[in-house]
């Protein structure tokens, strides 16, 4: 019988998507095959303290904060020097805990922007999902679009602002540029529609800019696209595959954080999408091309708008897509014939394969001294 792999699922974190991260992690833990894996949770609280929860059933039954308070979650630190045992107890005994592969499910800041991936690289650990560079590029939405546009991939147009930029007259200039007064003001590096605000007037624009700068030091302005919100899941390393597309049908004015997570009737999500075969294939091909262009690996969800005349536009790339019970990434693969348990198996295999390939690369170049 093969030895079980020890999988550490990371969740929580110091971002506005902390709670969503926990829900994603719970769904992953509940789905991973306990016959194949030894599962532990690494919980990062709101102030950045790390805890280990080695009883998955406790994590599924209680909130991580509750487990911290009652002592079931052990405080840990990062231990360098032994990749097989990266977590070290802070309880005084110095015990170290194993991990064969890490499944990061920390959404947003410090989890999806390359910071956590950099730490895992330093620990020499296999981990699921995009590497440092790809994570950083995809977290910065304006940088993502710059790269994709340079590669010929159609994207929603945008304008970037920093707090140092003058905003007087910007709204009118953008109205003239795009021919619409309906715009979106959004944080450059946040997800789950946090700090994403629709505006229709210059007064609303000014207020929205001020509000979004409370969350991020750069923002994007985009024309509002009156089209269908389509998503496509991508899976793989060197030869990625695309799922059948899914669709988000918001019942609010737009697909806000509240519509996503707080209002049970905030939106309808479906994997039975009424698109022509040609548009479906176009979406899948663009999703794969975008994935490869920013050098993603493992997984990503590519979000699109499809206009009434069937023009396909990329909106963004999400390198740690949600895995909650309503999340589209696993649902799209389920509709494509890949059930979630098998999807998780493949993601772990892809992570380990990539790590093994990286280990073959020459990292030290020995320069022989030239004899004088």
UniProtKB/Swiss-Prot annotation:
Entry keyword Amino-acid biosynthesis: no
Cellular component aspect of the GO annotation: cytosol
One of the protein's GO biological processes: regulation of cell shape
Enzymatic reactions: 2 D-alanine + ATP = D-alanyl-D-alanine + ADP + phosphate + H(+)
The keyword Nucleotide-binding belongs to this UniProt entry's keyword annotation: yes
Superkingdom of origin: Bacteria
SUPFAM superfamilies per record: Glutathione synthetase ATP-binding domain-like, PreATP-grasp domain
Pathway of action: Cell wall biogenesis; peptidoglycan biosynthesis
E.C. designation(s): 6.3.2.4
Annotated compartments: Cytoplasm
List of residues binding Mg(2+) 1: 303, 316
Residues the entry annotates as binding ATP: 176-231
Cofactor: how bound: Binds 2 magnesium or manganese ions per subunit.
Domain (ATP-grasp): residue spans on this chain: 145-349
Swiss-Prot/TrEMBL keywords: ATP-binding, Cell shape, Cell wall biogenesis/degradation, Cytoplasm, Ligase, Magnesium, Manganese, Metal-binding, Nucleotide-binding, Peptidoglycan synthesis
Binding site for Mg(2+) 2: 316, 318
Cofactor(s) the record lists: Mg(2+); Mn(2+)
Entry GO MF terms: ATP binding; D-alanine-D-alanine ligase activity; metal ion binding
Main location: cytoplasm
Stretch forming the signal peptide: none
Pfam families: Dala_Dala_lig_C (PF07478), Dala_Dala_lig_N (PF01820)
Record function comment: Cell wall formation.
Family, as annotated: Belongs to the D-alanine--D-alanine ligase family.
Matching HAMAP family: Dala_Dala_lig
Protein name in UniProt: D-alanine--D-alanine ligase
Gene expressing this chain: ddl
């Amino acid at each position: 019988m093969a030895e079980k792999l020890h999988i550490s699922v990371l969740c929580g974190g110091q971002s506005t998507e902390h709670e969503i991260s926990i829900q994603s992690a719970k769904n992953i833990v509940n789905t991973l095959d306990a016959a194949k894996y030894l599962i532990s949770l690494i919980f990062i609280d709101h102030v950045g303290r790390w805890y280990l929860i080695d009883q998955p059933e406790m994590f599924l039954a209680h909130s991580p904060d509750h487990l911290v308070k009652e002592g079931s979650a052990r405080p840990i630190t990062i231990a360098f020097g032994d990749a097989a045992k990266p977590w070290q107890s802070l309880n005084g005994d110095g015990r170290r805990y194993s991990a064969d592969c890490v499944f990061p499910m920390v959404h947003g800041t410090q989890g999806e922007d390359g910071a956590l991936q950099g730490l895992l690289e330093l620990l020499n650990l296999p981990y699921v999902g995009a590497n440092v560079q790809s994570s950083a590029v995809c977290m910065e939405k304006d940088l993502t679009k710059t790269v994709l546009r340079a590669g010929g991939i159609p994207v929603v147009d945008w304008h970037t602002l920093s707090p140092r930029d003058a905003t007087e007259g910007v709204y009118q200039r953008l109205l003239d540029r795009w021919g619409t007064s309906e715009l979106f003001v959004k944080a450059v590096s946040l997800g789950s529609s946090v700090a994403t605000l629709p505006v229709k007037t210059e007064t609303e624009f000014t207020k929205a800019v001020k509000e979004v700068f409370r969350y991020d030091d750069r923002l994007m302005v985009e024309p509002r696209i009156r089209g269908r919100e389509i998503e496509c899941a991508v899976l793989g390393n060197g030869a990625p595959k695309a799922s059948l597309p899914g669709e988000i049908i918001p019942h609010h004015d737009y697909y806000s954080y509240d519509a996503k997570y707080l209002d049970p009737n905030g939106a309808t999500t479906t994997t039975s999408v009424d698109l022509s075969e040609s548009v479906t294939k176009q979406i899948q091909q663009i999703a794969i091309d975008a994935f490869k262009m920013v050098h993603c690996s493992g997984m990503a969800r590519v979000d699109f708008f499809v206009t009434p005349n069937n023009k396909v536009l990329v909106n963004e790339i999400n390198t740690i897509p949600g895995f909650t019970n309503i999340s589209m990434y696993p649902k799209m693969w389920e509709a494509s014939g890949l059930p979630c348990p098998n999807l998780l198996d493949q993601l772990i295999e892809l992570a380990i394969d990539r790590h093994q390939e990286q280990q073959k690369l020459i990292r030290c170049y020995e320069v022989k001294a030239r004899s004088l």
